[in-house]
Curated annotation (Swiss-Prot):
Pfam families: Guanylate_kin, L27, PDZ, SH3_2. Residues 130-209 form the PDZ domain. Belongs to the MAGUK family. It comes from Homo sapiens. Residues 215-284 form the SH3 domain. It is a peripheral membrane protein. Its main location: membrane. This is Protein PALS2. InterPro entries: GK/Ca_channel_bsu, Guanylate_kin-like_dom, Guanylate_kinase_CS, L27_C, L27_dom, L27_dom_sf, MAGUK, MPP6_SH3. The modification Phosphotyrosine is found at Y500. GO terms for biological process: protein-containing complex assembly.
Length: 540
């Protein structure tokens, strides 16, 4: 308005304008009310703000790479690095870049829009959605695709990934265009395209309108090693999650019967794909065919032989060897003292020595059971000290009633550990230490006994031979073992570890009794100070 007023004043008479009209117009424009209206209009006028840049986070990370080596040279640089690495500052930049890269205006209609397959589906106008996302080159979106009715459909969204955090896409959404170009129907090509794009990405989608399901808090302990890059069945190797035996994972999605989504509890980070219980059991249970080529067709046509085996209690260990363990559901518990400490190992690896040392050093905290026997007591033996003496008929009746954890016969007499004797020690507030046969773990691994299972592994044959020679020379034992006996111990130790590894909370190689005792003592103390992951059945 000020510019118009100045022009009116300087307007030459040659324009033909009447002077009275100019005076009238000038009077209106100088009126205070009109000036106020003009100022209000300027204030309310919508002026579009343009972002200077939509990749500030990427620029800041590049700056950090350049100046981080100088933090020890200049205090100001160190302070700046600290500010730029602040989580709040990084989140602010990320939020700015996301907002700056979004398209708030109506997007221009693409050339394909008029004749595309979208129109052929006779969908309502409001079914088509245009979304804008911002990403860096090489940054995974955390999403996989599948072909459905010749369309590319979102098969799964990885928990914790970029798409999951933004919440803009959902499972079942159909991807029609990326940056104005139709995507076709090849999932791998789309994955590569999205992986290499940087900056602003505009997606045209047909929403699925499915209800989102809140993920359950499910945690599992893994009983096998897994590397997605060695898996030929996984739909996208880059989306897989690598883990090792014994790690704890959080399962965040189990909708797919073959592929679950999980994340590391200890390391955190985005979720990845892991084989489901069903899929991995099928893989582990698969056995190559045994063919019988003894028929009359000289091997040109053959029939499959099926191995039949009836379950026998005497062959319990053989069936344990073929038991398939994949995942075990667990729960996190605050620190607590376990009811039992179970030492598993081959004969002669030092379990009894470790047990006796714990009880002698701390009898108020640790105890053990007194075994039962059907043999007659000797003259110097008292009932309840080394053994509890009962009649054979009574012991056989209790064994039949399932009152014994384990039992055996030696030189015509029965020996065994009664379940009630374990509970008697626990009821005194002490941890009951047991050195039992590994088959007993099936009974012990319950909330009633809450065991901490430690496998005492045999060392290498040379080390075991040297240890045995040392105890014989010191006069600790008079029993001489041959190389065959020692090798049998090593082989038995390896067999037990293969068959029962999934039960073990800790493995200690006993190549030095003092060091093995220290390791075991440290592990038991940790149980009283640190949270523990235990089977879910112990909690619920």
């Amino acid at each position: 308005m000020q510019q118009v007023l100045e022009n009116l004043t300087e307007l030459p008479s040659s324009t033909g304008a009447e002077e009275i009209d100019l005076i009238f117009l000038k009077g209106i424009m100088e009126n205070p009310i009109v000036k106020s209206l003009a100022k209000a209009h300027e204030r309310l006028e919508d002026s579009k703000l343009e972002a200077v840049s939509d990749n500030n986070l990427e620029l800041v990370n590049e700056i950090l790479e350049d100046i981080t080596p100088l933090i020890n040279v200049d205090e100001n640089v160190a302070e700046l690095v600290g500010i730029l690495k602040e989580p709040h500052f990084q989140s602010l930049l990320e939020a700015h870049d996301i907002v700056a890269s979004k398209c708030y205006d109506s997007p221009p209609s693409s050339p394909e829009m008029n004749n595309s397959s979208i129109n052929n589906q006779l969908l309502p106008v409001d079914a088509i959605r245009i979304l804008g996302i911002h990403k860096r080159a090489g940054e995974p979106l955390g999403v996989t695709f599948r072909v459905e009715n010749n369309d590319l459909v979102i098969a799964r969204i990885l928990h914790g990934g970029m798409i999951d955090r933004q919440g803009l896409l959902h499972v079942g959404d159909i991807i029609k265009e990326v940056n104005g170009h139709e995507v076709g129907n090849n999932p791998k090509e789309l994955q590569e395209l999205l992986k290499n794009i940087s900056g602003s990405v505009t997606l045209k989608i047909l929403p699925s309108y499915r209800d989102t399901i809140t993920p359950q808090q499910v945690f599992v302990k893994c009983h096998f090693d897994y590397n997605p890059y060695n898996d030929n069945l996984i739909p996208c190797k880059e989306a897989g999650l690598k883990f090792s035996k014994g790690e704890i994972l959080q399962i965040v999605n189990r909708e797919d019967p073959n592929w679950w989504q999980a994340s590391h509890v200890k390391e955190g980070g985005s979720a990845g794909l892991i084989p489901s219980q069903f899929l991995e059991e099928k893989r582990k249970a698969f056995v190559r065919r045994d063919w019988d080529n003894s028929g009359p067709f000289c091997g040109t046509i053959s029939s499959k032989k099926k191995k039949k085996m009836m379950y026998l209690t005497t062959r319990n260990a053989e069936f344990d060897r073929h038991e398939i363990q994949i995942y075990e559901e667990v729960a996190k518990m605050p620190p607590f003292q376990r009811k039992t400490l179970v030492l598993i190992g081959a004969q002669g690896v030092g379990r009894r020595s470790l047990k006796n040392r714990f009880i002698v050093l701390n009898p108020t905290r640790f105890g053990t059971t007194v075994p039962f026997t059907s043999r007659k007591p000797r003259e110097d033996e008292k009932d309840g000290q080394a053994y509890k003496f009962v009649s054979r008929s009574e012991m056989e009746a209790d064994i039949k009633a399932g009152k014994y954890l384990e039992h055996g016969e030696y030189e015509g007499n029965l020996y065994g550990t009664k379940i009630d004797s374990i509970l008697e020690v626990v009821q005194t507030g002490r941890t009951c230490i047991l050195d039992v046969n590994p088959q007993a773990l099936k009974v012990l691994r319950t909330s009633e006994f809450m065991p901490y299972v430690v496998f005492i592994a045999a060392p290498e044959l040379e080390t075991l031979r040297a240890m045995h020679k040392a105890v014989v020379d010191a006069g600790i034992t008079t029993k001489l073992l041959t190389d065959s006996d020692l090798k049998k111990t090593v082989d038995e130790s390896a067999r037990i570890q293969r068959a029962y590894n999934h039960y073990f909370d800790l493995i200690i190689i006993n190549d030095n009794l003092d060091k093995a005792f220290e390791k075991l003592q440290t592990a038991i103390e940790k149980l009283r100070m640190e949270p523990q992951w235990v089977p879910i059945s112990w909690v619920y």
